[in-house]
Amino acid sequence: MQSELQRGFVLHRRPYSETSLLVDLFTEESGRLTVIAKGARAKRSSWKSVLQPFTPLLLRWTGKSTLKTLTKAEPAAITLPLQQIALYSGFYVNELLTRVIESETPNPALFQHYLKCLTGLATETNVEPTLRLFEFQLLQMLGYGVDFLHCAGSGEPVDFSMTYRYREEKGFVASLVKDNLTFYGRDLLAFEALDFSDDAVRQAAKRFTRIALKPYLGDKPLKSRELFTQNILLLK
């Protein structure tokens, strides 16, 4: 069965036989799926240059199984110019999607968040606000629900100047203990507003999303994070 023409992006690609590629796609209407791009590794294949991350594509495929066969791939726009830290950040976002969202689960809203994230990475000087916003949006799409506005212990509204300790599957409880699981009330209020304009809030948000995403990612390290760490000196 031939699919409708859809907008999408390449998340990851790897060799499949001598002449083909196995490609993870993220599409607007069908979500994440894996396709075989037959002949894409051949010298004269036009797909070799087209099937690249961060290039908006128009795609069509066929097949009823979980592994589809790509039948059409053409650029819908120019490749988003991600360079240096923005490029590694793009790899990180792609790996997140590959690891945490279920295959063939339509999510047009998440596709729009992803598109805005890539655009932000390509245009903004500081990539951190863009990354933190996408991580929180991804958590929302995964059904992750936590109340940033109330103390999980007392039900009282979060106080701007107090500290709260995160408890998995429960929320934030007022606490005088300060460790990796502790956040200021002002951080939680900013999280609720998706306001990552302040540097201290961004650092707290990064710490929180690592905690919140761990159950979805498991113990396997993110390759994109390792790659960034290995090359960080070259980026400075």
UniProtKB/Swiss-Prot annotation:
Keywords of the record: DNA damage, DNA recombination, DNA repair
Pfam families: RecO_C, RecO_N
GO terms classed as biological process: DNA recombination; double-strand break repair
UniProt GO cellular component terms: bacterial nucleoid
Similarity field: Belongs to the RecO family.
Biological role stated in the UniProt entry: Involved in DNA repair and RecF pathway recombination.
NCBIfam families from the UniProt entry: reco
Designated name of the protein: DNA repair protein RecO
Source organism phylogeny: Bacteria, Pseudomonadati, Pseudomonadota, Gammaproteobacteria, Pasteurellales
